[in-house]
């Protein structure tokens, strides 16, 4: 199966639109073998810290498990550890190691879904201006993340988190 990455996912932080918890989304994506996932909540970035921290926590646990599996494989191969079926134990440890490597390669993609006015920000003339367009923005690197943060924390008085209807 080709690798697949969701680039537009809402968490419980997308008010009235998302229900999934960050932990369950990450766990499911990793279990499905996805190499990453992008959290793009509606009009906010409230879940980004929890998302990034949870991925790092899972990766930290995997580093420890991978080190244990590598040590066990080495011990079984050189004979310092014995068991009834060393070949089966080595195969089991190699599967655990492969799963850990896959999780360690998982990429948390940081983004948001912004609202774009159809005409101009302050135009509110009936049906055409009742809803705006949605635009997905993804951070390519740390500078992109900082730019997203600036977009959402701008002190400009005309900046709105969501278009009012």
For every predicted segment, state its role:
Residues 1-154, 159:
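Phosphodiester-processing cores and adjacent nucleic acid-binding clamps
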Residues 163-165:
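Hydrophobic alpha-helical segments, chiefly the membrane-spanning helices
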């Amino acid at each position: 199966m080709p690798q697949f990455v969701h680039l537009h996912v809402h968490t419980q932080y997308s008010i009235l639109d998302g229900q999934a918890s960050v932990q369950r989304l990450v766990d499911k994506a990793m279990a499905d073998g996805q190499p990453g996932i992008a959290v793009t909540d509606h009009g906010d970035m409230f879940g980004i810290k929890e998302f990034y921290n949870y991925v790092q926590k899972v990766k930290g646990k995997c580093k420890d498990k991978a080190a244990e599996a590598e040590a066990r494989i080495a011990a079984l191969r050189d004979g310092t550890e014995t068991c009834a079926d060393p070949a089966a134990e080595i195969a089991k440890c190699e599967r655990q190691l492969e799963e850990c490597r896959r999780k360690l390669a998982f990429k948390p993609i940081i983004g948001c879904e912004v609202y774009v006015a159809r005409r101009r920000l302050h135009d509110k003339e009936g049906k055409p201006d009742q809803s705006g367009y949605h635009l997905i923005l993804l951070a390519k690197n740390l500078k992109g993340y900082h730019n997203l943060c600036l977009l959402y924390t701008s002190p400009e008085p005309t900046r709105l988190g969501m278009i009012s209807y």
